[in-house]
């Protein structure tokens, strides 16, 4: 058997969709698991919809996910190759020029609609004589090129996920392989490219199943070996409809911008439709996935995308999996974008060390860590009622005095100091912690106040407490 080779072939017409990202991941893992080759091919034959900026973002997002490739192609740079193979099909009688106008074709479609039957081309131009073809060309009539589909033939293939699939050619009829503007169509170029690039396994979404018999016929007509096909089940939203924008963020880019970790997204997408051999385990590194991934473990039924599950998994990566230095490097751009001072890396590293278990994404981190970076904040009117009593004033004054003597440097030392103040002033724990939290953060809830006091520089704590004491006195 030849060396395994797979490909991912996105169109640069928008952001990288999560479903397409999963296809890329499965194709990549299958190739790497089998010590095979992986190809990235940009399918940009449609000049109207293909955009260079989308191509650049696709490449960035794939690299961000940790996917690398051995070969790279753009279909727009391969038109000469496609022309050569179109001519081969014309010469062998497997294709013919079609001079039908858009109006004539629309009339055929309308008749099919009236009869309530699926549309298939009538084959009107299939039997034109060479003289008629020549005459129409001389008259300057625009023409497409259609593939001549054998009538009433059942095309059969064994899908590696879906099993036995049989589709009759009468279901689709002769189809266009080159448009009247000279641009080749998807079903044609994909065959030429997959054959010339030596693709052994075509792994893609199940929405491509209707294309497969057409492509098999082209493989046969050109004398190319037919690759194996694996059609992945669709990804659904939690309402069991196809995953789309109405389910919220559906692109890799959106999750990048929300502060998701590439390793977590890669890991989670891999589990959509694939069952790891080790039951009950969900966290896998890319290297582990390469070792254990097999198409035989891909389910036939649709997978449901659960954003909360992804968020949980992302939190696990932030808390337990990623080295602190990696988390630091990824956190910096988010903190900078929020306008926080990031000049003291050691300070930020200490903040993250103590707080990484309190957020699941880096966008959550920005809100969570505000008290570590923002000194000027308003205390809401309704929170002053917690401060405006004698005990709160005494607690804040005692705390200020103590930290001027010696600032606690760990959460444990902060808790010890709070207990001493509680005992000395004969108050309950909330009467110590609540005034401190409000004075230092302007909030009733948030990151552990013992952590904030341990990490925040002494002069910042003094400044925040003094501001409240001055207002209370």
UniProtKB/Swiss-Prot annotation:
Co-factor(s): Zn(2+)
InterPro entries linked: aa-tRNA-synth_I_cd-bd, aa-tRNA-synth_I_codon-bd_sub2, aa-tRNA-synth_I_CS, aa_tRNA-synth_I_cd-bd_sf, Glu-tRNA-ligase_bac/mito, Glu-tRNA-synth_I_codon-bd_sub1, Glu/Gln-tRNA-synth, Glu/Gln-tRNA-synth_Ib_cat-dom
Positions of short motif 'KMSKS' region: 242-246
Any GO CC annotation of this UniProt entry: cytosol
GO BP terms: glutamyl-tRNA aminoacylation
Keywords: Aminoacyl-tRNA synthetase, ATP-binding, Cytoplasm, Ligase, Metal-binding, Nucleotide-binding, Protein biosynthesis, Zinc
Motif position, 'HIGH' region: 10-20
PROSITE patterns named in the record: AA_TRNA_LIGASE_I (PS00178)
Compartments where found: Cytoplasm
Cofactor binding: number and manner: Binds 1 zinc ion per subunit.
PANTHER family: GLUTAMATE--TRNA LIGASE (PTHR43311), GLUTAMATE--TRNA LIGASE, MITOCHONDRIAL-RELATED (PTHR43311:SF2)
Function of the molecule: Catalyzes the attachment of glutamate to tRNA(Glu) in a two-step reaction: glutamate is first activated by ATP to form Glu-AMP and then transferred to the acceptor end of tRNA(Glu).
Family as reported in the entry's similarity comment: Belongs to the class-I aminoacyl-tRNA synthetase family. Glutamate--tRNA ligase type 1 subfamily.
Record protein name field: Glutamate--tRNA ligase
Species of provenance: Aquifex aeolicus (strain VF5)
């Amino acid at each position: 058997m030849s060396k395994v080779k797979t490909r991912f072939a996105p169109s640069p017409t928008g952001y990288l969709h999560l479903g397409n990202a999963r296809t890329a991941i499965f194709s990549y893992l299958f190739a790497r698991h089998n010590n095979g080759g992986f190809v990235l091919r940009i399918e940009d034959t449609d000049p109207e919809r293909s955009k260079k900026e989308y191509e650049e973002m696709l490449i960035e997002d794939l690299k961000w996910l940790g996917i690398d490739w051995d070969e790279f192609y753009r279909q727009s740079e391969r038109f000469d190759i496609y022309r050569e193979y179109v001519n081969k099909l014309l010469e062998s009688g497997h294709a013919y020029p079609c001079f039908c106008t858009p109006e004539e074709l629309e009339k055929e479609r309308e008749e099919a609609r009236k009869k309530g039957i699926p549309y298939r081309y009538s084959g009107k131009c299939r039997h034109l004589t060479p003289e008629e073809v020549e005459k129409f060309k001389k008259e300057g009539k625009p023409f497409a090129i259609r593939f001549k589909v054998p009538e009433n033939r059942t095309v059969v293939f064994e899908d590696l996920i879906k099993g036995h699939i049989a589709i009759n050619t009468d279901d689709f009829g002769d189809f266009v392989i080159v448009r009247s503007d000279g641009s080749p169509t998807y079903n044609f170029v994909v065959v030429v490219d997959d054959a010339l690039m030596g693709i052994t396994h075509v792994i893609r979404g199940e929405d491509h199943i209707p294309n497969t018999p057409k492509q098999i016929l082209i493989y046969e007509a050109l004398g190319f070996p037919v690759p194996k096909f694996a059609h992945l089940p669709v990804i659904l939203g939690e309402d069991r409809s196809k995953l789309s924008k109405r389910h919220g963020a559906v692109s890799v880019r959106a999750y990048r911008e929300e502060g998701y970790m590439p390793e977590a997204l890669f890991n989670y997408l891999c589990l959509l439709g694939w069952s790891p051999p080790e039951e009950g385990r969900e966290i896998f590194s890319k290297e582990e996935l390469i070792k254990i991934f097999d198409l035989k473990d891909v389910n036939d039924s649709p997978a449901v995308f659960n954003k909360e599950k992804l968020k949980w998994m992302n939190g696990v990566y932030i808390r337990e999996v990623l080295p602190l230095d990696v988390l630091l490097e990824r956190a910096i751009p988010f903190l900078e974008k929020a306008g926080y001072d990031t000049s003291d890396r050691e300070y930020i590293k200490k903040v993250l060390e103590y707080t990484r278990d309190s957020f699941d994404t880096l966008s959550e981190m920005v809100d969570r860590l505000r008290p570590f970076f923002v000194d000027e904040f308003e205390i809401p009117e309704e929170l002053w009622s917690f401060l405006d009593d004698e005990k709160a004033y005494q607690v804040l004054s005692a705390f200020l005095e103590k930290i001027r003597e010696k600032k606690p440097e760990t959460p444990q030392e902060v808790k010890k100091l709070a207990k001493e103040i509680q005992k000395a002033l004969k108050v309950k724990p909330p009467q110590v912690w609540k005034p401190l939290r409000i004075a230092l953060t302007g909030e009733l809830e948030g990151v552990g106040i013992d952590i904030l006091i341990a990490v925040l520089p002494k002069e910042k704590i003094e400044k925040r407490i003094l501001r409240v004491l001055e207002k209370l006195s």
